[in-house]
Regions:
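Conserved alpha/beta-domain cores
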Residues: 1-170
């Protein structure tokens, strides 16, 4: 409601507003649909409150759970865009808690168990394959699906290059 009302206020001031409402941490299309319905439910109320005929908006999701990447084709049937939350996706793929990595990742790096800290540099072989799969599957059911990255990896050059190679928009 707050996002739509803020957008309505901008429109009433003569400004453009086109919010992209992102539903986080979904694992299934049914869960996404359930949350997207909440947006659809308040939309007419906001229009009436502000005397508007339309507020353009999109509803998408963060792909942060490995299961969501695997089911991206189904989720994209409903979601209008994806943003890959690479911090949580890395955590859930590895089973590492970000709160505890300082206690063991330095040892893993020293022993060459892992080549880099996966929370600093995107693991292209594991997490990256979930991302590639999610992008491909999402676009297989929604051509032109807007896809991007959200997380610390978005500021790391090799991670950004990988995201560009798999076809992300941002």
């Amino acid at each position: 409601r707050a996002i739509l009302e803020g957008s309505a206020e901008l429109i009433k001031e003569g400004k453009k507003a086109f919010p992209e409402i992102m539903i986080p941490v979904v694992c299934d299309v049914a869960e996404f649909r359930n949350q997207a319905e909440l947006v659809k439910k308040v939309y007419p109320d906001v229009l009436a409150k502000y005397g508007l005929k339309k507020i353009p908006y999109m509803v998408g999701t963060m792909i942060e759970i490995p299961r969501a990447a695997l089911l991206a084709d189904k989720i994209a049937e409903e979601a209008e865009f994806f943003s890959f939350g690479t911090n949580d996706l890395t955590q859930m793929t590895y089973g590492f808690s970000r709160d505890d990595v300082g206690a063991f990742v330095p040892g893993y790096l020293a022993k060459k168990i892992i080549p880099v800290d996966p929370f600093q540099i995107l693991d292209q072989n594991g997490v990256g394959q979930l991302i590639r799969m999610g992008v491909e599957r999402g676009r297989s059911s929604r051509a032109g699906l807007k896809v991007g990255i959200c997380g610390e990896h978005g500021g790391e050059p090799s991670s950004v290059m990988f995201c560009h190679r798999v076809g992300m928009d941002y």
